[in-house]
């Protein structure tokens, strides 16, 4: 009987200890942000099309359909392009969470006031995570964007 009581107490202590440790497993320190939903991305741009004319210059950027809330395409140089999800990583589930392009200056979310560099890194505002980046492949004048 005493052994049974000791086993019960030990089981309860183990349960309490495990329960107390679980919140400590949250690496974000309690500031967990919801994740941007996943969406299949497979887009192609013809860089010589007039609608893509901003991509003829370094740091030129355009927005296109695709992804969760759209895709931002940025030209780094003639042979290097970056593509990002327009859904802001700060509060991605807010209906107004959509990053916009201020030509040749910055990327910004008017909803939460976060600002991002043309490499997708947060520069100002509450966002601490970079924009979700998609893969790009250039073949002649055809830019393919995938995830």
Feature locations, PLM:
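Eukaryotic intrinsically disordered, low-complexity regions
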Residues: 10-14, 25, 30
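C-terminal motif of bacterial Sec signal peptides marking the signal peptidase cleavage site
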Residues: 20-24
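Bacterial N-terminal signal peptides that target proteins for export
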Residues: 1-13
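N-terminal pre-ligand scaffold of iron-sulfur
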Residues: 27-104, 115-117, 132-147
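Residue-level recognition of alpha-helix boundary/capping or hinge positions
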Residues: 1, 55, 106-108, 122, ...
